[in-house]
Amino acid sequence: MYQKLDTLKDGDILVLAGSIPNTLPEDVYEKIMERLQGRKIQIVVDATKDLLLNVLKYHPFLIKPNNHELGEMFGVELKNNEEIIEYGKKLQEKGARNVLISMAGDGAILITEKGDVHISPCPKGEVKNSVGAGDSMVAGFLTGYLKNGDYEEALKMGIATGSASAFSEDLATKEKIMELYEQL
């Protein structure tokens, strides 16, 4: 695995997502980020509690907790956008550059490294399968960001992609993603 990581080049993006298999050490995300430190590789982390908190010292480009995971990290129940933003900023204080907080049917909040806060609702639709919607949101966010470095564009594309995934029985189509994007 480390040999593959060593082939990453400046400008590449690495997404670390999900739980860690029992066959790997619990600190594998930390070891990966430590190994890549100092290189110009954008790292995205979509993981829960300690897996996420323990990598913040390596300043990941983007982290994506949901609002429930965010509250769990700090032992609080987050009741509104103001509280979600407050605790999202605490993750930045710990080292995250950009924090994307998904809120299921309530949309998402993005707190950028520039200090901007973007809040976007979720498009209307019937949830058919939410498995993978968070992963789709990350992929959409990166697609939008890579277009021109615009965080607001990235947030809209992330929400459209995650929503299209949740509103589909199988994989979302580009047509459905763009239809939802236009609603935002």
Where do the model's predicted regions map?
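Conserved beta-alpha-beta core of the PfkB/ribokinase-like small-molecule kinase fold
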Residues: 13-83
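Structural motif
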Residues: 12-13, 98
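Conserved phosphate-binding/catalytic region of the ribokinase-like
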Residues: 34-35, 53, 81-184
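Conserved phosphate-binding/catalytic loop of the ribokinase/pfkB sugar-kinase fold
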Residues: 1-10
